[in-house]
Design a protein with these regions (language model features):
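Short strand-loop junctions, especially beta-strand C-caps/beta-turns
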Residues: 68, 139-140
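Short beta->alpha junction loops/turns
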Residues: 115, 140-141
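Active-site substrate-recognition segment that forms the wall
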Residues: 1-32, 36-132, 212-222
Length: 222
């Protein structure tokens, strides 16, 4: 697994692209602040927007708040410089206070970013190489924490050549459509991001570009 870095297998080089995700962490909330927002069960939350946010409380009483931006850089570039994007954090902070207006004035103690690999089917794909001696999984699209254990078991099944319930799943057998090479990748991804944002502001109504991508099974997500 190479995560966001280029695949060592030529067949997979166009299967994923790296996108940058950004997150903020608040200072610890007081009991009064927790009461004000009514988040009693402290479960993790993700909204249903195309350019979605995710947020959850921490054990020491903070709120982790991230998402929205999923930024792609021309040529599938990965560079630590892309992790320092003040405008992304300012936008996230604005969205945070829109979500929790009761917490206006709360400060953020941490901010960070990182790249994830995304595939056109929004979930990992699997395969073998070197005559079946190597198994791989890639394209977790930000879902790796929950699915890597499953992926590890799938890869063990593939190495064993075993026909199991896992290896018979459509999501394991199917390969995603590849992303196009440059400059089509950058143009297509940025146009798609703009269309996704427009859909979020039009009660989810998708334009012709998104409907076409849906029809052919080609997508972009963070």
């Amino acid at each position: 697994a190479t995560n966001v870095f280029p695949s060592l297998l030529a067949r997979n080089k166009l299967m994923t692209v790296p996108v940058y995700d950004y997150a903020l962490m608040t200072e610890p909330l007081t009991s009064e602040q927790w009461d004000a927002i009514g988040w009693r069960d402290r479960q993790g939350i993700g909204d249903m927007a195309n350019q979605f946010h995710y947020y959850r409380p921490t054990q020491d009483g903070r709120i982790l708040f991230g998402g929205y931006d999923a930024l792609y850089h021309y040529g599938r570039r990965v560079d630590p410089r892309y992790e320092n994007r003040p405008e992304a954090w300012r936008r996230l902070a604005s969205h945070f206070f829109t979500t929790f207006p009761q917490l206006e004035g709360l400060r953020f103690s941490h901010q960070w970013a990182g790249a994830i690999d995304t595939s056109t089917q929004f979930t990992a794909f699997f395969g073998t190489a070197r005559g079946g001696r190597v198994a791989y999984a890639a394209g977790f699209t930000g879902l790796g924490v929950g699915s890597t254990r499953f992926a590890g078991n799938v890869m063990l099944d593939l190495l064993d050549g075993a026909d199991t319930e896992r290896t018979s799943l459509e999501m394991v057998r199917r390969r995603p459509l590849p992303f196009p090479p440059e400059p089509a990748a950058a143009i297509g991804i940025n146009l798609t991001r703009r269309s996704l944002d427009c859909a979020d502001h039009r009660e989810g109504r998708r334009d012709l570009l998104l409907k076409t991508l849906d029809a052919v099974g080609l997508g972009f997500d963070s």
